Amino acid sequence: MTAGNSSGVTDGAGAMLVGTRESMEKNGVMPEARVVDWTVVGVPPSLMGHGPVPAIEKLLAKTGLTIPEIDYFEVNEAFAVVNLHVEAQLGIPRDRHNLYGGGVSVGHPPGVTGLRMAMNGVQHLKETGGRYAILSMCLGAGQGLAMLIENSSD
C-alpha cells in the first residue's frame, strides 16, 4: 500500500435523513432503506486494510445471512488492494461489488465517504429491487466496520 494506489483526499458534501420509521412517516418522508445491524472489529495494526473481511464475516454470522443472499457490497477502497482482498477472501462476485466507483476513482472526502457509500447502496437496491446491501470499510490502525441495510422502497 502506497500513496500511488491510495484514494485521494477530496472535498465532498452530502445529506441523508436518518430516523425511526414512525418519525419519518409522521413528517411525510418515506424511508428507502433501514439499518438492520452493524459490526466493528479490530485486527492487528500491521494488517491495516484487512478489517472489512472479519467485519463482514461477523455481520453475516450475527444476521444469519450468507454472501449469496446479499445483493450488493460497497467497500471503501482507501487503497486499491482492499477491495481485491475482500473479494478474494469472501468470494464476492465482482458484479455485486463497488459498481459505482470507490475512493480511488471518486475520491475519499473525510466525513462524507460513509454517506456516499450508503447512498450508493440504497440507490442500487432501489433501482434493482434488491433486498440487502453491505457497506464496509477499514479504519485506521486495523479496524473494520460493516453495516447491513435493507431495501424499504415500496
Residues of each region from the PLM?
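Claisen-condensing/thiolase-fold acyl-transfer catalytic domains that form or cleave C-C bonds
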Residues: M1-D154
